[in-house]
Amino acid sequence: MIRTDAKDGALVLFSGGQDSATCVAWALERYQTVETLGFDYGQRHRVELECREGVRDALKHRFPAWAGRLGDDHMIDLSVLGAISDTAMTRTIEIETTANGLPNTFVPGRNLLFMTIAAAIAYRRGLRVLVGGMCETDFSGYPDCRDDTMKALQVALNLGMDTRIVLETPLMWLDKAQTWQLAEQLGGDALVELIRVETHTCYVGERAELHDWGFGCGECPACKLRKRGYEAYLKGERVTEAPL
């Protein structure tokens, strides 16, 4: 049984994808009040934003114990981020590795901006906990997904706002198979199926074909990782190496 911090409310960064949907469920099991926050930054796969409402509605209707805890949703226009980012996440270009070793899907400063804005909203809403789906196990090397980055950001935000906000990253040390397993632990097969069908991960925004592991093109790094993680989860295995 996961403990509940009744006195604390949480704001979850919720994109509409697998990881953030799992984080919403994690927070709903843990906190009495959970609000969600999404960002429209001109992402190529903005279909994920269209999935958010369906996921929230499904969580309310299929999990009665969580229905009363799921609070307001916030959507922020961050089109300026897309305007200054020449990446495969915001442009229709081929996904490849750049000279610095990072994939060109990396959007510089994205998670730093996300968490800063989230902290400002949480401060205003009286919420003490921020929850993000950052992960340093199955990831593409994004520096703003690292544990050290999140810890440093927590310090900076608390100093800058003279508060005591806590940044929670429940997926930080989980691989994708373990993320699927966490969903099962939180909400059983019903939550796994909700995440499989209702969330979106594919970088190119393909949502025409439903695979065993969910919708997607099946070829981009995000789809390959989700597919491998789901297959390993079904077999009870771990996935520790992200695909190229």
Curated annotation (Swiss-Prot):
Keywords: ATP-binding, Ligase, Metal-binding, Nucleotide-binding, Queuosine biosynthesis, Zinc. Zn(2+) binds at residues 202, 217, 220, 223. ATP binds at residues 14-24. Binds 1 zinc ion per subunit. Its cofactor is Zn(2+). Coiled coil: none annotated. It comes from the Bacteria. It catalyses: 7-carboxy-7-deazaguanine + NH4(+) + ATP = 7-cyano-7-deazaguanine + ADP + phosphate + H2O + H(+). Gene3D superfamilies: HUPs. Pathway: Purine metabolism; 7-cyano-7-deazaguanine biosynthesis. Its EC number is 6.3.4.20. GO terms for biological process: queuosine biosynthetic process. One of its GO terms (molecular function) is ATP binding. Belongs to the QueC family. Catalyzes the ATP-dependent conversion of 7-carboxy-7-deazaguanine (CDG) to 7-cyano-7-deazaguanine (preQ(0)). This is 7-cyano-7-deazaguanine synthase. It comes from Burkholderia ambifaria (strain MC40-6). The lineage of its organism: Bacteria, Pseudomonadati, Pseudomonadota, Betaproteobacteria, Burkholderiales. The gene is queC.
